[in-house]
Each structure stands twice: as C-alpha cells, then as structure tokens.
Amino acid sequence: MDYPTLLLALLHVYRALCEEVLWHTSVPFAENMSLECVYPSMGILTQVEWFKIGTQQDSIAIFSPTHGMVIRKPYAERVYFLNSTMASNNMTLFFRNASEDDVGYYSCSLYTYPQGTWQKVIQVVQSDSFEAAVPSNSHIVSEPGKNVTLTCQPQMTWPVQAVRWEKIQPRQIDLLTYCNLVHGRNFTSKFPRQIVSNCSHGRWSVIVIPDVTVSDSGLYRCYLQASAGENETFVMRLTVAEGKTDNQYTLFVAGGTVLLLLFVISITTIIVIFLNRRRRRERRDLFTESWDTQKAPNNYRSPISTSQPTNQSMDDTREDIYVNYPTFSRRPKTRV
C-alpha cells in the first residue's frame, strides 16, 4: 500500500471515530433488551436490515419478503424477532444474553415503495435509569387538548451552534428535534409524536406540543452547544392532568402541605401531652413513696383514757326492760 492510500485510510478511520453519531432513541443496556423499530407509514416493504455502527457498519440481520430472514452468524444465537414473517411494520430487534460488547449504536434501515429509505439509529448506553439522574429546572401543568410551548433561553454569551430537544423517560430517551445552526441542518426526528420547532439563529429555542394528552407527561430537556465549546442544559417537567390548571395544582399542593403540617403538629402535641402526664405521674409516685417513708416510724395510736366520762356511751347502752308476769284476779276472796 502506497503512502497516499494509507493516509486516506487513516483519515477515513479518524473521521469515523470523531464524527458524532446522531441517534433517534437512547436505551439502557440490559442482558435482555429490545431495540424498537416501528415504521410509521404503510408503504410496500421491500427490505429491512439491521446494522451495528462502529468504524464500519456490521450487518446483523436482513429480511426480504421474497427471500425471508437471514441473521448473521455472530448474532444468530443472541438476537431474534417476535414476528418471524415480518408481515407488520414492527421490526423491533430483541437481544438475549447480551454482553457489554453490545453497547454502541445500531441502525434499522427500511426500504419501502414508494416512500424510499427510512432509517432509525438507536444508542445503547450503560445506565440504570435516565429520569433519576436528571433533576428538573421548572414544572409546567396543563390540561389535555391544549398546545404546550416549551422554551429555553441560553445564558451563554457565545453564539449557539446546535440545539437538541429530548424527551426523557425511565427506560428511554427520544430525540425530538436537532438543529445545527452552523450548517443549517435540521435532523429529522423519528419520534411518533408531532413536534413543532424553530430552527433559526436567535436567543430562544422553542418547541410546541400540539393537543397534549396524558401520555405527553414527562421530562423534556433542551441541550445547547456553543461554538466555543460551552454547553447548557435546561430540563422541564410537563404534567398533563384532567381538569387541573396551574392554579388548581398550586392549591392542591398547598392544601396537601397544610394537611401534612397539621398532622405533624397533632402528633407532636399528643406526644408532648403524653410525656408531661407520664412525668407528673412519676413525680407523684416518688412523692408518695417519700411521704410513706417519713411517716412509718411515728405510726402509733394514743391509748384511750379510762378516766374520761363515758356518759354518752352509757346512755347509748341503756335499754328498757320488759317483764312478763301473770294476771291476777281482782275479785275478793270468799270468807268462810
């Protein structure tokens, strides 16, 4: 191999390693995981192929309605599809007994007629839960059916180079929109929900979620990247609840806080009263024991004086005596 050819090969590898891979969905690594690929349109499917993206694209599996399914040898025992006939538009790839070597980027490429090529890139990362590591900066509450506008304004002074909006869920992050303001490129999202966004130079970045439903609730992240290397992140939590406006939600939270405070005060009062009663009872018992101890040596009674008159007692013991005697006749005796 001559020097120019070697240099071009090294340059190609360097660009492949350094170039940022734009993904549509990010999922955490697991031994048994699924990479979702659902084609939104109803065109005629001609071929589907899964790749793992690295320095080059390694083919994992390929399906054709005419020739059937072929899974490449390194993945034959580790991946499968639920719908073996591929009659539907769901081309989700399932892993069994995956290893850390399976962390990386995957591409699901569909070829349809007459729409053409449709591609989705999925990133597999080492993470337990996405929501747990992302605190929110603000909270927005809305009723179903309304249009919700999410806005982030950078504090950086450098010109913004790229803006990325994401929806964060516990087991998945979906890219909503990506704007490269330097090259004027808008990365097409594969998110099944319609999102309206502006991709223009300015101090604000805005997305609009029309006709929101309860399923739109969650965390939304705005990621701003400056040309000087500075980055800023804003996270907003959206709650879509039936019949609850911002004021009603605030009243609900305030009422719950007041009830919780009253409950804590009641419990504290009961505990204080119980401790005071217990303390008084212990003091009373201690005083009684001390009094009995002091009184025990003088526990005697004065003798009753016999010289004192007992008239009252004698009077009380006097009783009337009744005698039964025969009745004698009062007639005079007859003299002889």
Curated annotation (Swiss-Prot):
GO terms for biological process: cell adhesion; cell recognition; natural killer cell mediated cytotoxicity; positive regulation of Fc receptor mediated stimulatory signaling pathway; positive regulation of immunoglobulin mediated immune response; positive regulation of mast cell activation; positive regulation of natural killer cell cytokine production; positive regulation of natural killer cell mediated cytotoxicity. Expressed by peripheral blood T-lymphocytes. Residues 297-314 have a biased composition (Polar residues). The modification Phosphotyrosine is found at Y322. Residues 276-336 are cytoplasmic. Residues 297-316 are annotated as: Disordered. Its main location: membrane. Changing Y113A: Significantly reduced NK-cell killing. The chain crosses the membrane at residues 255-275. InterPro entries: CD226, Ig-like_dom, Ig-like_dom_sf, Ig-like_fold, Ig_sub, Ig_sub2, Ig_V-set. Interacts with PVR and NECTIN2. Competes with PVRIG for NECTIN2-binding. Interacts with ITGAL; this interaction mediates CD226 localization to lipid rafts. Cell surface receptor that plays an important role in the immune system, particularly in intercellular adhesion, lymphocyte signaling, cytotoxicity and lymphokine secretion mediated by cytotoxic T-cells and NK cells. Functions as a costimulatory receptor upon recognition of target cells, such as virus-infected or tumor cells. Upon binding to its ligands PVR/CD155 or NECTIN2/CD112 on target cells, promotes the cytotoxic activity of NK cells and CTLs, enhancing their ability to kill these cells. This is CD226 antigen. The lineage of its organism: Eukaryota, Metazoa, Chordata, Craniata, Vertebrata. The gene is CD226.
